[in-house]
Amino acid sequence: YNIVLRYVHTAREGAARLGKLIEQYGSAEGFGIGFIDDKEIWYLENACGHKWLACRMPKDQYFVTGNQSRFRDYAPEDKENFMAAPDLIEFAEKNGLYDPNDAEAEKDKHGKAKFDFHKAYSRDEELDTTYNYPRVWGLQQMFSPAIQNDVTKNTFPVFAKAAHKISLTDLRTAFRFHYDHTDHDPYLHENGKEPYRPVSIFRTTQTHIIQVRKDLPHAIGHITYVAFGMGDLS
């Protein structure tokens, strides 16, 4: 709050200010943070150091992330939907994190290898196959059953369309998710060594759902639902 929210009025301004602070001061580790107002939602991913990328969330799709970078695409010319460190691509190219002449990569509209933010600035490790991928896979299966993905591979769509409008009840269910009634349900099977990390875990200190009802006055239109502790016990 002290370094961002008190200085901004919109979600876009919030993402832009935090990005400038990252450029100026740097950061020790990657993270993601969302900003919401009554018109837009922006989500910023930090790539450690002084690099960052922020995307405006599509209004007809949802976004799920674990403890890992999820963004892929970046179109510098699309100022309406993207903001980033000004040298995001150039730095990656200069330091061998991105090769615009990669013959095997998907091409952009200029005929160059498409820039992939996750590939350039993040990584996929063995731990992700049990700690991060399953949560993204599980919630996308919950909201979009038609999506067929291998839970062991990071090929999940960044944004996805839900099979139906997502309600507050759906979000509460999502925050309580622990691979319910499957072989990976650690609570059902009393398996303290279950490898898949659930969304709902005992070390959760707070669970938040933020709702913006733009047709109502600010005083009653913006609501935060908070559960103190793991979602499944709320």
Question: What do these predicted ranges mean?
Answer:
Residues I36, E40-Y74:
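A cross-kingdom feature marking charged/low-complexity
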Residues N2, R6, P58-Q61, Q68-R70, ...:
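Glycine-rich loops and low-complexity Gly/Arg-rich segments
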Residues Y7, A11, Q24-A28, Y43-A47:
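Short capping loops/turns at secondary-structure boundaries
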Residues A15, G19, G26, G30, ...:
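C-terminus-biased signal that marks the final domain/tail of proteins
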Residues I33:
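Active-site-adjacent helix/loop patches that line small-molecule binding or acyl-intermediate pockets
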Residues Y1-L21:
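Well-ordered mid-protein domain cores that form the structural environment of catalytic cofactors
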Residues I3, Y7, C55-R56, A160-H164, ...:
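Generic alpha-helical structural element
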